[in-house]
Curated annotation (Swiss-Prot):
Signal peptide: none annotated. Its cofactor is Zn(2+). Keywords: ATP-binding, DNA-binding, Metal-binding, Nucleotide-binding, Repressor, Transcription, Transcription regulation, Zinc, Zinc-finger. This is Transcriptional repressor NrdR. GO terms for molecular function: ATP binding; DNA binding; zinc ion binding. Negatively regulates transcription of bacterial ribonucleotide reductase nrd genes and operons by binding to NrdR-boxes. It comes from Chelativorans sp. (strain BNC1). Belongs to the NrdR family. A zinc finger (unnamed) spans 3-34. Residues 49-139 form the ATP-cone domain. Binds 1 zinc ion. One of its GO terms (biological process) is negative regulation of DNA-templated transcription. Coiled coil: none annotated.
Amino acid sequence: MRCPYCQSEDTQVKDSRPAEDGAAIRRRRACPVCGGRFTTFERVQLRDLVVVKRTGRKVPFDRDKLHRSFEIALRKRNVDPDRVERAVTGIVRQLESFGENEISTDDIGLLVMEALKSLDDVAYVRYASVYRNFREAKDFQDVLGELRGEPELE
């Protein structure tokens, strides 16, 4: 593994342990050249997923982008980072188990909303406002009604 500090190819694993409920291996590494220390995660990748955008454009699935979506929705919210990581890992597992290599942004968005609903109501509303492209205050009222279990009014 290349050192992120000095780009040396010669790094050493100092410690390995299971992470994310056994779904990954966390490795603590050290660079003998510059003395830098860093952590890497090793995960199983069942298949190469491709995201189909609303425009029809296809891009490789990016787990980090999914994680950033959670971070943006949860900004300044007090949610345990381990719960967020478990939610992201759960979504990736669901996507891989769909049996399809191509996944629509709509499918991903629905899974994110479902996960956020159980993590934090405010983050759920934030994400929904972007995902559903809210245009007026009534859109917020509708999603708040969903959270309270009220029937949707048309």
